[in-house]
């Protein structure tokens, strides 16, 4: 749970900083982003938004899976059985060892949406902004690597329990 809180706070901070910089509401933040982006503050904004979107999406996926543990209303036995089976599949898919897989899927969707946006901008007569797309990719990849580092202990624990069960 600490991992989820950490990823949610980093994701929220990244999205908030990118939004504040985009709105030009904090002069010191704009100066810092201009310095970090070497005159292109939008590059840092795209990096932070790529990082924040992936981490917040992972937090929402896992939070939804954790919150849906009970049936909210009585159901017929067939629907209740279907709900229990679906819930067990969702829980298996949102175990900590699968969070990195989920982040890779979400990062891929985000990068494809960014690429589609840049292609749409290029078709509208504006230039295709390769640097901004590459910063979206870098932010998403950084989020995946960050989650992979945070989940390393869970991977190790799962590998050890699997080897005990399989008799290796």
Where are these regions (language model features)?
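Bulky hydrophobic segments
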Residues: 1-168
């Amino acid at each position: 749970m600490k991992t989820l809180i950490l990823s949610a706070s980093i994701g929220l901070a990244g999205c908030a900083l990118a939004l504040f910089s985009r709105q030009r509401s904090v002069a010191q933040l704009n100066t810092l982003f201009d310095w970090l982006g070497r005159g292109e503050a939008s590059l840092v904004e795209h990096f932070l938004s790529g990082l924040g979107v992936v981490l917040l999406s992972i937090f929402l996926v896992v939070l939804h899976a954790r919150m849906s543990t009970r049936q909210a209303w009585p159901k017929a036995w067939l629907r209740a059985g279907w709900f229990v089976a679906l819930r067990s599949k969702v829980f298996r898919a949102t175990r900590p060892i699968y969070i990195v897989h989920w982040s890779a899927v979400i990062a891929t969707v985000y990068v494809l949406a960014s690429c589609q946006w840049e292609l749409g901008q290029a078709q509208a007569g504006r230039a295709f902004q390769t640097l901004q797309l590459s910063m979206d990719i870098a932010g998403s990849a950084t989020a995946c690597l960050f989650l992979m580092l945070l989940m390393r202990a869970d991977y190790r624990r799962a590998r050890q329990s699997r080897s005990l069960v399989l008799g290796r």
